[in-house]
Amino acid sequence: MPFKTRVTEMLGIEHPIVQGGMQNVGYAELASAVSNAGGLGLITALTQPSPEALAAEIERCRSMTSKPFGVNLTYLPTLNAPDYGAFAKVIINAGITIVETAGSPKVREIWEMMKPHGIKIVHKCTSVRHALSAEKHGCDIISIDGFECAGHPGEDDVGGLVLIPAAKDKVKIPLLASGGIGDARGFVAALALGAEGINMGTRFCATKEAPIHDNVKAKYVENDELGTNLIFRKFHNTARVGKNSVSDEVVEISAREGAVFEDVRHLVSGAQGAALLKSGDLDSGIFWAGMIQGLIHDIPTCQELIDRIIGEAEEIVKGRLSGMVA
């Protein structure tokens, strides 16, 4: 039984399941596999070295799926900012109809470029106040990120069980629940809390089509819900990453009195993280990981994963939950 929501209607997808944009993971292989399975796959724009490379990756994805897919474009905290406008123009010229964004309020500049072309904007937020601001400025769907998520959970430390319904109470546009979701139980819970779909990152990393080393996938299966570290807290740019010797060292150095970001910069470079995903050397850098690791027990195909979530969700709704109603 398909679950029909405003998200499936707006995005033209079969199931309200979105693969979040992930740096050095969101390539055509994964995006097309998710879309072919009835969800929404996303190519990560800034994983590509140039706007021209993004255009080629979009065409490569089109050769692998006839289903809708989108592009993620995140405003990163960096000293050497990429040419966001050039990447946005490639997205527009390629006829992409769905874009996931995240990052600073400056991201609205590319919304203004894209909205006249009918592009649907899905914006990732970690607080209700940010979600309300995004809605006010023309966003179409909010992806609300609970504290359990991989990547940047914000500085408020509010878990999805509270954050999702809190956002639903105030935001009128559709919500995707993100962070700590990886199976049918989380999917049904998200719908009950007021979301109209889910966004998964770490769970899609542990699939056969994810273009990362098997050692990394195995680590997601091996780890439990405690297998993450929160880094950069002192620098007000909190990030949740997989627990390993490098992230342990980042936490230890950051806890020292007077510590500054320069003290850990050599440990957390994006180049090292990208190399880790390719080499499988789990102590050569940091890698993104959410608390959902505790509920990841296998490495299925994207089709198997999505089919399982939808099938088991139907069983929960029609079976276990309905049986509780007197």
Predicted regions span which residues?
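Conserved active-site-proximal phosphate/metal-binding subdomains
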Residues: G154-L176, G182-A326
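Active-site entrance/lid segments in N-terminal catalytic domains of soluble metabolic enzymes
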Residues: M1-K170
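Active-site metal-binding loops of divalent metal-dependent hydrolases
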Residues: M22, G180-I181
